[in-house]
Amino acid sequence: MSSAATKATFCIQNGPSFEGISFGANKSVAGETVFTTSLVGYPESMTDPSYRGQILVFTQPLIGNYGVPSGEARDEYNLLKYFESPHIHVVGIVVAEYAYQYSHWTAVESLAQWCQREGVAAITGVDTRELVQYLREQGSSLGRITLADHDPVPYVNPMKTNLVAQVTTKKPFHVSALPGKAKANVALIDCGVKENIIRCLVKRGANVTVFPYDYRIQDVASEFDGIFLSNGPGNPELCQATISNVRELLNNPVYDCIPIFGICLGHQLLALASGASTHKLKYGNRAHNIPAMDLTTGQCHITSQNHGYAVDPETLPKDQWKPYFVNLNDKSNEGMIHLQRPIFSTQFHPEAKGGPLDTAILFDKFFDNIEKYQLQSQAKSSISLKVTYSTDKSRLQSINVTKLAKERVLF
C-alpha cells in the first residue's frame, strides 16, 4: 500500500459510518448500498448491469487477489469472455481487505487499476461484518463513499430512476450460432442482459437478435421461434414500455403458442404484464448459494441470485399462472409457469457465472418449447437470416441481420 494512501469514509444515510482507505477512482459517489455473499466472481458482478447505480459490499474478506482479466477478450461467439458487459455498472465497492498483490494467469491489471480507469470509487478497511449485519436488520440503505479531500455528495436513490434505459442496447444487434449449428431465431429484449445469458442461447443453437428494452416486440414476434426477457437493474414498475409491449404480446391470440422465457427482471416484467404485482425485498438476495425448490417436482436447486424486488405470487392470475420455484431461505417467489402456454420465468439466474449450474437445464426446457413451436408452425429446417424490425417504431422494414451490429450498441 502506498504511503500516500487517501483516506475515505463510507456512510449510511441515518446510519453508521466507517473509515477506510480509497483504492479506486479519485471521486466521491452515492447510491443504494447492497451486499453479496458470493465468494468469487467480482469482475462478473461489477460488470453485471443489474448492479447499476449501487454501492456493492463484498462479504468475502479478501477481494482483488486474482486481479482483473481482459475486457477485450472475446469467445467464439464474439461475446465478452470474462465480463458480463463492457463496463463496470456499480458506482462503488466496499471491501474488508483489498489484495494489493494479485496473481492469476488471466489477469491483465489490478482491481484498483480497473476501478480507477472506469471511474469507480472503492474503499478498503471497512468492517463489512458489522455493515452487512446492519443492512440485514435495517434493509438496503442509501450510502456514499467520501474521499478525505472531497465534499460529501448528496445521497441518491437510483431506484427512482429508470435504470434499464441507461443499460439497454441503443440499437438492435445480432449474435449468431456457430456455422451449421443454428436451430432457431430468438428475440431478446435487453433490459440489461448479461453476456453469459446470450452465450447460453447461442451455444444451444439460437441466432439471437437483441432489441432495446422499449422495442415493440409484438410487431415482430412472428419472425421468431421464441422470445427472451432479460435481467436488468432497478424497480420493475418503471419499465412501463416493456410491460405494455409484453402485455400486448400476451393478449394477442396469434402468439398463443410462442415460447417465452424470462430471467430476473424479465420474470418481474412478465408478472406485471400478466396482472400480478411486485414488491421490494428488505435487503434482496445476492449470492451464489441460495436454495430454490421446484414446486412441480419437489427438487431443491442451488441458485445464483441478484435482485432487490420479487413477484407477489398471491397476485398471479390463478387461471393462467402458478408459482414455479420458491426461495427456501425467505419463502419469496423464484419463478412462475403458465398453465396452458409454453411460458415460464425465474427470479434466479440459471446461466450463473460465477455460480452453480444446477438450473441450466431451464435453457434446454426453453429450446424444447421452441422445437415444439416450430413443429406446430411447420417450420422449415433452414434458418432464415431475414427478420423484420422497426427502426422508428412506426414503420416496419425487412433487413438482413448480417447488417446489424454484432455486439451491444452503447451509444
Curated annotation (Swiss-Prot):
<feature type="binding site">
    <location>
        <position position="232"/>
    </location>
    <ligand>
        <name>L-glutamine</name>
    </ligand>
</feature>
<comment type="subunit">
    <text>Heterodimer composed of 2 chains; the small (or glutamine) chain promotes the hydrolysis of glutamine to ammonia, which is used by the large (or ammonia) chain to synthesize carbamoyl phosphate.</text>
</comment>
<keyword id="KW-0067">ATP-binding</keyword>
<dbReference type="GO" id="GO:0005737">
    <property type="term" value="C:cytoplasm"/>
</dbReference>
<keyword id="KW-0547">Nucleotide-binding</keyword>
<dbReference type="InterPro" id="IPR002474">
    <property type="entry name" value="CarbamoylP_synth_ssu_N"/>
</dbReference>
<keyword id="KW-0963">Cytoplasm</keyword>
<keyword id="KW-0028">Amino-acid biosynthesis</keyword>
<protein>
    <recommendedName>
        <fullName>Carbamoyl phosphate synthase arginine-specific small chain</fullName>
        <ecNumber>6.3.5.5</ecNumber>
    </recommendedName>
</protein>
<dbReference type="Pfam" id="PF00988">
    <property type="entry name" value="CPSase_sm_chain"/>
</dbReference>
<dbReference type="GO" id="GO:0004359">
    <property type="term" value="F:glutaminase activity"/>
</dbReference>
<comment type="pathway">
    <text>Amino-acid biosynthesis; L-arginine biosynthesis; carbamoyl phosphate from bicarbonate: step 1/1.</text>
</comment>
<dbReference type="GO" id="GO:0004088">
    <property type="term" value="F:carbamoyl-phosphate synthase (glutamine-hydrolyzing) activity"/>
</dbReference>
<dbReference type="InterPro" id="IPR036480">
    <property type="entry name" value="CarbP_synth_ssu_N_sf"/>
</dbReference>
<dbReference type="Pfam" id="PF00117">
    <property type="entry name" value="GATase"/>
</dbReference>
<dbReference type="InterPro" id="IPR029062">
    <property type="entry name" value="Class_I_gatase-like"/>
</dbReference>
<dbReference type="InterPro" id="IPR017926">
    <property type="entry name" value="GATASE"/>
</dbReference>
<comment type="function">
    <text>Small subunit of the arginine-specific carbamoyl phosphate synthase (CPSase). CPSase catalyzes the formation of carbamoyl phosphate from the ammonia moiety of glutamine, carbonate, and phosphate donated by ATP, constituting the first step of 2 biosynthetic pathways, one leading to arginine and/or urea and the other to pyrimidine nucleotides. The small subunit (glutamine amidotransferase) binds and cleaves glutamine to supply the large subunit with the substrate ammonia.</text>
</comment>
<dbReference type="InterPro" id="IPR006274">
    <property type="entry name" value="CarbamoylP_synth_ssu"/>
</dbReference>
<feature type="binding site">
    <location>
        <position position="309"/>
    </location>
    <ligand>
        <name>L-glutamine</name>
    </ligand>
</feature>
<feature type="active site">
    <location>
        <position position="349"/>
    </location>
</feature>
<dbReference type="GO" id="GO:0006541">
    <property type="term" value="P:glutamine metabolic process"/>
</dbReference>
<dbReference type="GO" id="GO:0006207">
    <property type="term" value="P:'de novo' pyrimidine nucleobase biosynthetic process"/>
</dbReference>
<dbReference type="InterPro" id="IPR035686">
    <property type="entry name" value="CPSase_GATase1"/>
</dbReference>
<dbReference type="GO" id="GO:0006221">
    <property type="term" value="P:pyrimidine nucleotide biosynthetic process"/>
</dbReference>
<keyword id="KW-0055">Arginine biosynthesis</keyword>
<feature type="domain" description="Glutamine amidotransferase type-1">
    <location>
        <begin position="185"/>
        <end position="376"/>
    </location>
</feature>
<feature type="binding site">
    <location>
        <position position="308"/>
    </location>
    <ligand>
        <name>L-glutamine</name>
    </ligand>
</feature>
<feature type="binding site">
    <location>
        <position position="268"/>
    </location>
    <ligand>
        <name>L-glutamine</name>
    </ligand>
</feature>
<feature type="binding site">
    <location>
        <position position="306"/>
    </location>
    <ligand>
        <name>L-glutamine</name>
    </ligand>
</feature>
<keyword id="KW-0436">Ligase</keyword>
<dbReference type="GO" id="GO:0005524">
    <property type="term" value="F:ATP binding"/>
</dbReference>
<feature type="binding site">
    <location>
        <position position="234"/>
    </location>
    <ligand>
        <name>L-glutamine</name>
    </ligand>
</feature>
<comment type="similarity">
    <text>Belongs to the CarA family.</text>
</comment>
<feature type="active site">
    <location>
        <position position="351"/>
    </location>
</feature>
<feature type="active site" description="Nucleophile">
    <location>
        <position position="264"/>
    </location>
</feature>
<feature type="binding site">
    <location>
        <position position="265"/>
    </location>
    <ligand>
        <name>L-glutamine</name>
    </ligand>
</feature>
<dbReference type="GO" id="GO:0005951">
    <property type="term" value="C:carbamoyl-phosphate synthase complex"/>
</dbReference>
<dbReference type="GO" id="GO:0010494">
    <property type="term" value="C:cytoplasmic stress granule"/>
</dbReference>
<feature type="binding site">
    <location>
        <position position="50"/>
    </location>
    <ligand>
        <name>L-glutamine</name>
    </ligand>
</feature>
<dbReference type="GO" id="GO:0006526">
    <property type="term" value="P:L-arginine biosynthetic process"/>
</dbReference>
